Structure formats: C-alpha cells, structure tokens
Amino acid sequence: MSAAQGLEYIISLTDQISAPLKGVMKSIDDLGKRGEAAMKKIGLGVAGIVGAGFALKSALDPAIELNRALGEVHSLGVADDALEKLSKTALNFSSQYGESAVDFVRSSYDIQSAIAGLNGNELAEFTQTSNLLAKGTKASAATITNYMGTMYGIFAEDAAKLGNANWVNKIAGQTALAVKMFKTSGDGMSAAFTSLGAAAKAAKIDVAEQFGVLGNLQATMSGSEAGTKYKAFLAGVSGAQKELGLSFVDTNGDMLDMVTILNKIKGKFGDTLDVAQAAKLKKAFGSDQAVDLIKLLLPKTKELKNNIADIAKVSDTKALAQMARSMVDPWSRLSQIITGVKTAIGGEILKKLDPIMHKVADLGQEFIDWLKTYKNIARWIGYAVGALIGFTGLTAALTLMSGIISAIGVAFSFLASPIMLVTAAIVGLGIFIYKFRDEFMQFISGFIQGFKAASVSLDPLFNAFSLVWGALQKIGATIGRIIGLFGGASDSAYSFQQFGIDLGYALGVVFNTVLDAVELVAQAFNFVADVFSIVVNSIIDGWQAVLTLWDSSAPIDSFLKIGDALGNIFLNAFQGIVNAFVKMLNFIIEKANSLPGINIPLIPEWKDNPTAQALSPALATGVSDGSNFSLSDSLQPQLNSMPQGSVTKTLTQNRTEQRTVNYGGVTINSNNSEEIWQKLRNKEQLAAG
C-alpha cells in the first residue's frame, strides 16, 4: 500500500467515525439537559412542598404547643370545661403581661399535681395568681408554683375556711407586700417558708406574723437562713420559759406573739445583749440561731408590730397586679399578642384538622398492618421504590457526565483561544530569555558600544544646536538693551518693576475688598444670631420671673414686682439689640475709614446711665431714654469733598520707595529711578573712555 493510499484510508476512516461520534455526543448532551431539567423540576416541587409544610406548621405551632400543654393537664383528670377556662385565662394573661401562655398552662400542671381537689375555675384562679406573683416578685413560675404548693400544704385549713380562690389571692397579696416591704424577692420568701415548714403554724402563729418575722430577718440574711433561725427560736421557746423565769404562753397554753415575747425579753435584758446575756439566752433557747433572731429583732419590736399589722390587712391582689403591670415590657406584650392571635386561629383550625389527621394516622397504621400481612407486596413495593431511586440517581449521573464533558470542552476551547496562545507565547519568551540571559546581556552590551562608536556622525547636529543657542543669546541681549532705554525716557514713566508693584497693590486692594464683603456678611449673620439669642433669653427670663415672683397671698405686690422685672428684662433686651446693630455699623465705618481722606467717628454703644437710674425705678438696669441716642455735633460724621484723582495722588505721596541696583559688583541705593539710571550711564562712559 502506497503512502497516498494509506492517507486516503485514514481520512475515510476519520470521516466515517466522526459523524457517529458527533451523534453520540449530541445524544449524551441532550440527555444531560433533559436530566438537568427533570432534576430542577423535582427540586422545585420538593422545595414547594417542604416550604408549604413548614409555613403551615409555623402558623399552627403556637396552637399545637398550647394543645400539648393542655393535654398534659388533662392527663391529671381535669375536666374539659376547666381546661377551656384555663386556656382562655392563659391567653388573657399572656396578652396582658407579655408572658407565654404555654408556660402558664404547664405551671398549672404542677399546681394540680401539688394541690388535690381543685374544682371548676379554681385551677385557673390558682394558676393566674401564681403567675401574677411570679411576675410581680421577679421569680420564675416554677419557683412560685412550688411555693404555692408548700403554702397550701401548711395552711390547708385556712384555705378550706376561706375557699381556695380567696385564700390563694390573700397569700399572693401578702407575699407581694412582704417582698416590697422588706426588699426581698419571691425566691427568698419561698426559700424561707420551705425552711420554716409548719413549725410556726403548729404553734398557731398567724401567717401575717410569719411574713413579718421572716421578712425582717431577710434584711441581713438569705431566706433559707431566716427560716432556719425562726424554726430554732420556736423550738426553744417552751424550754426557755423555765430557764429565764418568763412565761411565753397565754391562758390557753398557746404561744404568745413574737412582739410580746420580745418585749418580755427586753424587759429582763434591755434593748441590747452583752456576752453574758447572750450566753444565758443560748442556754435557755438551746441554739445560736435563736439568739441571732433575738439580737436582730429586739431593737425593732415597734417596727415589727407595724409590719405585721400592715400585712394582715391585705386580702387581695390589687397591689400585686400593679407591681406586675409596672414590669411589663410592651414589646414582649406585643409579641405575645401576635402569638395569641395565631394560637386562637390555629386552635380553631386544629379542631377541624385533628380528626382528619387522626384518620390519616389510622389509615397509615392500617397500611402498616396490611404490609406486615402481605409481605410479598411490601417487598415488590420496596423494589419499585428502589428502582425509582436508582433511575433518579442514573439521571443525576448522566447530568454529571454531561457537565463534565462540557467542562472538558470549555477547557480545550480555552487552551486553543488566542488569549491562551498569547499567554503561552509570553511565558515561552520569558523562559527563553531567562535560559539565555547571559548571551542577551553580552549582545546588549556590544550594541551599546557600537552605538557609542557611531556618535562622531552626530557632531554636525550638535554644532547646529550650538549656533542656534548662540543666536538666541544675542537676541536676548539686544532686547535687554532696548528695555534699558525706557528707563531714562521720561521722569513720569514707571519702570517694569514699579509697574509690577502697582499691579500687585491694585490686586491686593481688590482682594481686601472681597474679604471685607465676606466679613460684612459674617457680621450681618452674627447680628441676626445675637438678636435671636437676646429675644429667646428674654422670653425665658420673663417666664422664670413670673414663676418666681408670683405670690398668691399678695397679688398686687406680685404684679408690681413682675412688672418691674419684665421691664428690666425687656429694656436689657432692647439695649442688647441696639448695641448689636451699633457694632455692625461701626464695622462698616471702620472699613470706610481705611480709605484715604475719610475719617468718620464711631458710634458709641448704649451703656448704663446713672441719671436714668435716678429718674425712674423702672430703668434699674441702667437703660437711658431715647434722647440720649442723638450724637453731638462734634461726633457727627464729617464727609469732606475730595477733588478728582486725590486718592491716587495721596497714595502716591504717601508711598516711600527704596530702590537697590547691583551692577558689576557695585551696589547703588536711591529713591529716584532717574538717579540710578544716570549713575549707570556714567559708569559705562567711564569704562568706555
């Protein structure tokens, strides 16, 4: 086979293979595009479904959470009507005080667990009062819920007598007053009663007295420590009677109140205790904790009695509600109102959706049972799902392959592009130059030497430039001599130097005029500012004078004093305005006086006048009357007429010139330009002779 035949064979084979390959590539590309479109549609569909689901869940979440909390309470056996009341109370409390309705309902779970036998609306009342107390005393709902459970366990008999709702309102109100009175907190009071327990109640001590004692003790110690000391005191009262020779019980054998016991101890030992007395009390009561209580409360028996009386008067939550409202954050309240609206709407929707969701869940459960029964069907369903997932993965793989092929094509297109070729050429040239850098340096060095060797041929050009430069120097010297002739042509002619001086002076005058105009505008602005400040300050001073001098018991004298004060204030204001205007006029006069031939006297400012003070009490500030504003004849501005050109003449006469000329090393000083030029000509003639 010849070379030509082999070449024809290769070309033919290439043509036959290229077309099918192009078709395959096009098919792969089309398949990739269809796969990409399908994946986009699937992604958009899934995103839409998920987004709609999340939006619906977000809208229903508040209602779902509230229903869950109500379900927890319902598990304790609470009736449906009580749950409905609890739900409404929770939403109202949330919107009024900015607290979570869900937390409100969940706190009712703890209350119902701790207090058995709450019926009807009592659970909602207990929960609302507990959360109100938590809000007003800066405690958590969980802490106050436990506190209410503890208090109910101690004072269950009182609750039965008053009724659960009335009792909880009384306890909450007294707790709030104690917290406010003794600067403690709901947490501290809860810890105090938790430590005390039922010891005081067993001694038949009223709850108001317990609040008073525990509150006073918390001024110097924690709530739990206060409860411990009070409990130790109660435990030692019975044995201390015999040791101290005092009786701490009444005729019925019941323990006396704390104030009476303290007064008996005070009568025996005084207001304060020394070391020996404290030791004796410790022996009597049996503990240091009891002695600490006595030391703290012994000087405050009168105050303690008043505190107990004030606490005993409280039977509701009016003061507590006011405390809670003062702590409401309006933004939290607005947020909870929005949540409440979503809860109310969502609750009504859930009433319709819950049965449907239960049906769907039941169907799902039945479908699971059916699949467990017919395992073959479950297996084939699994195969179908697996195949669907596999086809989806295959589509994604084809899309990936199409993208890879496209990326490879783009890469080869870039490699074959003019930009890449130029870049490659530059890089190659740089590598070539770096590789043969020594040879290039030798070549450049030789080139420079050869160019320098050829510089002889440039001498004619340099000579031509020298001739031109010499001609220019001759022309410049000639022009200099011509200019010199003007110096002696006329005595009245200015030299070029004098012309520059006059031109600079004229420009300076113009510039000063512009600056004066700007300064005048600034003075006018300052005048307006002064007037504004004077007027406003006068109004303020006048109002303050009215408020200060008015006496309802002596209205006539008050009016006279106010009139005098207002007169002085407004006369001072008028004086300030006049002086500000005079300052601006004097500024204009000063600028006019800077011109030759003008001498206008300045206008005097309005100052205090003793004569005016003697003439009228109303002019106490020294303001003179209108007659004093006129100027005397000697002070009147005198405007003298000036002949034409007198300003220029005056400027010329007032100008002193000093000229200095250095010629050939000789310095000539003179005020006469003609004299300088004459001396120069004499020097030249002497040199020429």
Curated annotation (Swiss-Prot):
InterPro entries: Phage_tape_meas (IPR010090). One of its GO terms (biological process) is viral tail assembly. Keywords: Viral release from host cell, Viral tail assembly. It holds the Pfam family PhageMin_Tail. Belongs to the P2likevirus tape measure protein family. PANTHER family: FELS-2 PROPHAGE PROTEIN. Serves as a base for tail tube protein polymerization and acts as a template for tail length determination. This is Probable tape measure protein.
